[in-house]
């Protein structure tokens, strides 16, 4: 069985676009709500946990969807146990490249400890926006990233897509299991 199969390019793009969509939707949430709680560390951490879970389940859903699609007889891709981890590569590479640009900006585009060029400011905003859902749980500011922030930034996409993909392989959906408890039954 080949790790990289024909047709996976579209799946990689789909996963990457799901990551970008999740970041943008959570950013809209952040700018309307999080700004009010940033000075309250406990509330800010709780909001970060909530946003991290929303991000996790967004990627989980994508992994689940791709596994269910791979099981169809007419697709060019096949299922295998850790394909979800392989499908997380675009997100991992994107996060790593943004981290390198962030480090570059803070090491080479600063003047007296402040970013002074449009490029440096752009790299900073891009990285902080891409990782903000974890910002209440760790320190990501001023060119400094806590070591455990990388655990969140890299492990969450791998775990979400892998767990979602494995669940999709076995036709398990956490949303279907929780639906009876979430929706009210109509009375006849």
Residue positions per predicted region:
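Loop-to-transmembrane boundary segments
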Residues: 5-20, 77-94, 144-149
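Transmembrane alpha-helical segments in integral membrane proteins
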Residues: 58-62, 146-177
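Hydrophobic alpha-helical transmembrane segments
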Residues: 121-160
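Hydrophobic alpha-helical membrane-insertion segments
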Residues: 83-122
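Transmembrane alpha-helical insertion/packing segments
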Residues: 1-66
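Juxtamembrane "helix-exit" motif on the non-cytosolic side of transmembrane helices
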Residues: 27-39, 100-111, 139-140
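Short, highly charged, low-complexity non-transmembrane loops/tails of multi-pass membrane proteins
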Residues: 172-188
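Membrane-helix interface/capping segments
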Residues: 56-87, 100
């Amino acid at each position: 069985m080949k790790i990289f199969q024909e047709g996976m390019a579209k799946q990689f793009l789909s996963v990457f676009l799901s990551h970008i969509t999740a970041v943008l939707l959570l950013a809209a949430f952040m700018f309307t709500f999080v700004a009010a709680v940033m000075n309250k560390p406990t509330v800010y951490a709780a909001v970060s946990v909530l946003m991290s879970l929303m991000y996790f389940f967004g990627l989980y859903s994508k992994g689940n969807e791709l596994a269910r699609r791979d099981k169809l007889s007419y697709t060019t891709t096949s299922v295998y146990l850790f394909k979800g981890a392989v499908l997380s590569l675009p997100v991992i590479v994107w996060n790593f490249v943004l981290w390198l640009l962030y480090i570059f900006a803070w090491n080479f585009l600063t003047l007296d400890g402040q970013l002074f060029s449009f490029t440096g400011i752009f790299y900073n905003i891009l990285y902080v926006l891409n990782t903000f859902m974890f910002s209440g749980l760790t320190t990501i500011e001023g060119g400094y990233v806590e070591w455990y922030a990388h655990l969140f930034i890299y492990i969450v996409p791998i775990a979400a897509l892998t767990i979602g993909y494995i669940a999709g392989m076995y036709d398990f959906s956490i949303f279907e299991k929780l639906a009876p408890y979430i929706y009210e039954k109509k009375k006849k």
